[in-house]
Amino acid sequence: MINDYEATRPMTTDAMPVSGEGTMDNDDVISTLNGLIETCKDGEEGFREAAAGVKNSEFKSLFADFSLQRSQFAGVLQELVRSLGGDPESEGSIAGAIHRGWIDLKTALTSNDEKAVLNECERGEDSAKNAYAEALEQALPANIRDILEQQSQSILAAHNRIKQLRDSEGHRSASSGF
């Protein structure tokens, strides 16, 4: 099993199979990885905004950690794209952010509703989970698949943590009369 350090460490090019029996074309692998880079960059920015916009110190710290994690994931994926001879994406896109579920985060932040912020972060994580699941359905080289599976597991853990916080925030609000 790959630990978090290995999931954020780029592989050397000599360990990178480009194509083989049953694996994707090199350009398709690059395209898949670039899509995940955008997903990670969108998550990085979404979590950065969430960290800056909440008052709860636990949420602020958690969102900052998730933002850093997504930045590291994107860095690993960018190195993989370079090692395959491709030009890696360097940022998310407005269209990508909308598609990936981060669009309502600013509204949630301006309302000072932490449960709404958690809902929007969870929605963003749902989109990231789906993007990784779609990528993992492809016939990727084993070394790339291993990295994506580890990153996917970390995203699932983040999603579950956010969901847990959101659910406990809902119970807290209900018990306080809000």
Explain the meaning of each model-derived region.
Residues 44, 74, 78-81, 102, ...:
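A structural signal for well-ordered alpha-helices, especially hydrophobic packing surfaces
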Residues 30, 34-37, 41, 67, ...:
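Generic structural concept
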Residues 120-178:
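Preference for long, well-ordered alpha-helical segments
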Residues 58-95, 158, 162-165:
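Conserved alpha-helical segments that form or flank metal/cofactor-binding pockets of metalloenzymes
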Residues 9-17, 76-129:
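Carboxylate-rich helix-loop segments that flank metal/cofactor sites and access channels
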Residues 21-55, 115-139:
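Alpha-helical bundle segments that constitute or directly flank the non-heme di-iron/ferroxidase center
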Residues 28-36, 57-75, 114-118, 143-155:
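Alpha-helical scaffold segments that form or flank carboxylate-/histidine-based iron centers
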Residues 2-14, 20, 24-26, 149, ...:
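Low-complexity, polar/amphipathic intrinsically disordered segments that mediate membrane, lipid-surface
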